[in-house]
Every structure is written in structure tokens, then in C-alpha cells.
Regions:
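N-terminal capping segments
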Residues: 19-135
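Aromatic side chains
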Residues: 67, 135, 161, 207-208
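Low-complexity, Gly/Ser/Thr/Pro-rich intrinsically disordered linker/tail segments
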Residues: 177-224
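Bacterial peptidoglycan biogenesis and beta-lactam-recognition machinery
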Residues: 94-99, 173-175, 213-214
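...with weaker cross-activation on analogous glycine-rich loops/strands in unrelated enzymes
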Residues: 47, 108-187
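Hydrophobic membrane-insertion alpha-helices, especially the h-region
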Residues: 2-16
Length: 224
């Protein structure tokens, strides 16, 4: 009996993980929700910005970088290393934007107190959740924090949890229409049905949508 219980205890997490990975998911169309399409295609690849941001986040999720928040003197960590904020700049890179440069520029023209930092550091400022929340609060569209207003949550949106964690909204939804989140807190599945659960622990402090049409003066495009 003891051996059986041990085997059960060991196998349950694996079974749960497999279930989470392969359980059915839904899309906006299943709930009569029209998916918002950006009018901008910054990198001119034939895919609108919101879809590009989503796909960039998903590529990072599929790459499954090891969770490691150490400081990198070059600013950008290697592709196989990352934290939650790295999902965001990588998603923006896939859409053609240099999020690091935009954050750096805004810190330089703003009061440092706005960003709650003692001094600018280009190598890390764009990798801090608090700084990204300040930046998006200033320049992105601020949207509902009500997760049950499901039509207002769209693929490529940015969600911030209590100023401590950040992710990208997926195009996948659970049976109640609540969208999945693409994020990195070191968990096995990087695209998961976690919005409602996480919001109960860390209340949502920001929900944003990027619209470069309104931001010509601050946009910096990615250059290889």
C-alpha cells in the first residue's frame, strides 16, 4: 500500500501536467467575440502587430527558456534564459519594436521618480515589471481589469499582476471564455489557463493594448 501511495503521489503531478497541456481550449469565435486586428504591421511581414506580439510570446513559450533573473551586462539575456519581462520584449521584437530603447528613452525624458528608480540602467530597466507598467500606462491603451468582461481581453494584450508579474494574453480561452496567459515564472507550461487563478493571488494592476498609430513620437523599431 505504501509503495502504491508513493507511486500515486509521484505520478499525479505528471498526470495533471499532461491534462493541462492537452485539455481542450476555445477561441474567440466560440463565444461570438470578434478578434481585434491592429491597423499597424510595423515589420511589414503581412501579419498585424497584435498577432505578431502573440506569436512572438508563443515562440518564447515554445523555446521554454530557463527562469533566471540575473543581470546581464549586455542587457539582453541569451535565448535560453529569461523571466516574465523577457517574454514581453521578445514579443515586441517579433512585431518589429525595440521595447528596450523605448523604455530607455522615456526614462531619460521623464523624472526618474516616475519609474521608481534611483538611476537609469539600460541593461535592466526594460526587464523590470514596474518599469514596464509605468511605460505602458503612459503610452498604451489602458483597458478593463475585469477578467469576466471576456470580449475586452484580446490576443496580444499585456497583463500585469500587482506590479510584480507580466504576461501576454493568448488567443486560447477556457470553457468560460477567459483567455490563457503566455508568461514565464519558471512553470512547466508557459501558455496556460491561469488568468483567473493568478488574479486571485496577485490582483491585476494593468491591462494594456499597444497601438503604434498613436505613438509616432516615441516608437523605436527593431534593427538587427
Amino acid at each position: 500500500i505504501i509503495i502504491a501511495l508513493v507511486i500515486l503521489a509521484v505520478s499525479l503531478p505528471f498526470v495533471f501536467l499532461v491534462y493541462q497541456k492537452y485539455k481542450p481550449y476555445y477561441t474567440a469565435g466560440d463565444f461570438g467575440i470578434t478578434t481585434v486586428v491592429s491597423e499597424v504591421d510595423a515589420n511589414q511581414n503581412g501579419i498585424d502587430d497584435y498577432q505578431d506580439i502573440l506569436l512572438g510570446a508563443r515562440m518564447d513559450a515554445d523555446n521554454h527558456p530557463t527562469y533566471d533573473g540575473r543581470y546581464w551586462s549586455a542587457g539582453y539575456p541569451p535565448d535560453d534564459i529569461g523571466v516574465c519581462t523577457d517574454v514581453i520584449w521578445r514579443a515586441f521584437k517579433n512585431a518589429g519594436y525595440n521595447l528596450r530603447a523605448m523604455v530607455d528613452n522615456d526614462i531619460l525624458i521623464s523624472n526618474e521618480e516616475d519609474y521608481h528608480i534611483d538611476y537609469p540602467d539600460s541593461n535592466i530597466d526594460f526587464r523590470r515589471v514596474g518599469n514596464l507598467q509605468v511605460f505602458f500606462s503612459k503610452y498604451a491603451q489602458s483597458l478593463t481589469l475585469d477578467i469576466y468582461d471576456i470580449s475586452e481581453w484580446q490576443p496580444g494584450d499585456i497583463v500585469v499582476f500587482n506590479g510584480k508579474h507580466i504576461g501576454i494574453i493568448s488567443d486560447r480561452r477556457n470553457r468560460d471564455g477567459i483567455p490563457y496567459v503566455i508568461h514565464n515564472s519558471g512553470q512547466p507550461l508557459r501558455e496556460e489557463d491561469v488568468l483567473e487563478k493568478r488574479a486571485k493571488i496577485d490582483p491585476i494592476s494593468g491591462h494594456f493594448r499597444w497601438n503604434a498609430l498613436e505613438l509616432e513620437d516615441i516608437v523605436v523599431y527593431w534593427e538587427e
